Amino acid sequence: MSVELWQQCVELLRDELPAQQFNTWIRPLQVEAEGDELRVYAPNRFVLDWVNEKYLGRVLELLDEHGNGMAPVLSLLIGSKRSSAPRAAPNAPLAAAASQALQAAAANAAPAAAPAPAPAPTSAPAKKAAAQKAAEVSEEPSRDSFDPMAGASSQQAPVRAEQRTVQVEGALKHTSYLNRTFTFENFVEGKSNQLARAAAWQVADNPKHGYNPLFLYGGVGLGKTHLMHAVGNHLLKKNPNAKVVYLHSERFVADMVKALQLNAINEFKRFYRSVDALLIDDIQFFARKERSQEEFFHTFNALLEGGQQVILTSDRYPKEIEGLEERLKSRFGWGLTVAVEPPELETRVAILMKKADQAKVELPHDAAFFIAQRIRSNVRELEGALKRVIAHSHFMGRDITIELIRESLKDLLALQDKLVSVDNIQRTVAEYYKIKISDLLSKRRSRSVARPRQVAMALSKELTNHSLPEIGDVFGGRDHTTVLHACRKINELKESDADIREDYKNLLRTLTT
């Protein structure tokens, strides 16, 4: 009976919690029953402490509500339910098995394939090996190859972008840089980049018949460049003789200026209009460059008319690029425009585990979770944080622990805590919606105030470690059920209301960048 009651409570928690939190902390729980006792297993003290603070109270409430007066006695253990000698943790909470959460995250990140079976309970060493293997499915994108620590004998030298020179007759020498380390195989896929990855693969595997142009947009360090290089590398793998040209938009401008200086503009046009695939990064740098926009406009038209593939990236939606001609914005919308969002928690953990594995460094799962929960903005910041931790570990001759991470990232963590405080969230939301902070704390229920208040509560729940009662208290003394309702409402609206979805995304980016 205890196991059935537990499963019932888990289903209720699935409805109450955001999918990310449920999948990370609740879904992988290991339980077993013996008589009236329900044993719940967690992998380590870090996870126990986290769940104790965030979820234990609600779990006990549900067990009591649905146990018909016969709620089971909970025994909380550290280990696995098949472990021969689990370690008791008196007064410890229910917890998620972090290693299995990693397996679930990596499974979600893998390219579409046959559904993987649910992980069976295993011994702790086997779980660790399986989680590490799962984390190796892919690698999160970055502009530069990973070089965690210069001078460390245990690490490989960084792999630089390969220079691929395409020579044509005339005065100009055209160079395309494709980074061979950026492939689809080592790209970590998650909810934040799933559509972008699928679209890029469609273009790479079926050029000229997929989406043309493909326009990827999003903040820095989220994987746009990785996907662009992955397409180019796949095209060359299929056809080594293909003329695939990757360049930054400023390089296109520089080439055009040089062509004008050398009186070789016809050669410039002939080269760029004869490629099989043109990949241009950071197209927003064309803004207010009228001659460059004019030339690119005609090049773009010629390529699409000839059935050649065009892929573009930008840090913002094309129609939001100020100083870009409307005719270009219109043409960029002819194909598919896809946003690349900041990675969610599971993906961030998988990134860190993969990068640590590449660097041949042992990164405990609780350490990966600790970093991932605090560095939310983009992959480059994650990599930078991990590099500092690895360097600190190497120079101090110490293993990577939570304590060492706190020491090595002290300034960064202090800044993050300052940026994502509830006070700062309230101030940022009030400024965004052009209302007063006092409105957020008031009893006013008009939609112009109530909706921003709900957004601020949802952001506080996602970005801080405060409990629901604590959040309610700083929003005018509201109770935890009001905060829970606000979070559920905003999650629903993000699925159905494009304006709320865009507002939430903009605020999240502001608070975590």
From Swiss-Prot:
Annotated region described as Domain II, given as residue ranges: 87-176
Disordered: region residues: 113-163
UniProt-annotated stretches for the region Domain I, interacts with DnaA modulators: 1-87
Keywords from the named record: ATP-binding, Cytoplasm, DNA replication, DNA-binding, Lipid-binding, Nucleotide-binding
Chain sites annotated for binding ATP: G221, G223, K224, T225
Organism: Pseudomonas fluorescens (strain ATCC BAA-477 / NRRL B-23932 / Pf-5)
GO cellular component terms listed in the entry, alphabetical order: cytoplasm; plasma membrane
Claim: Transmembrane is one of the keywords in the record: no
Major localisation: cytoplasm
Function (record text): Plays an essential role in the initiation and regulation of chromosomal replication. ATP-DnaA binds to the origin of replication (oriC) to initiate formation of the DNA replication initiation complex once per cell cycle. Binds the DnaA box (a 9 base pair repeat at the origin) and separates the double-stranded (ds)DNA. Forms a right-handed helical filament on oriC DNA; dsDNA binds to the exterior of the filament while single-stranded (ss)DNA is stabiized in the filament's interior.
Oligomer and partners: Oligomerizes as a right-handed, spiral filament on DNA at oriC.
Name of the protein in its database record: Chromosomal replication initiator protein DnaA
Region listing for Domain IV, binds dsDNA, in residue ranges: 394-513
One GO BP annotation of this record: regulation of DNA replication
Entry's localization field: Cytoplasm
Biased composition (Low complexity): 123-135
Similarity remark: Belongs to the DnaA family.
Sequence segments annotated as region (Domain III, AAA+ region): 177-393
Entry domain remark: Domain I is involved in oligomerization and binding regulators, domain II is flexibile and of varying length in different bacteria, domain III forms the AAA+ region, while domain IV binds dsDNA.
Molecular function in Gene Ontology: ATP binding; ATP hydrolysis activity; DNA replication origin binding; lipid binding
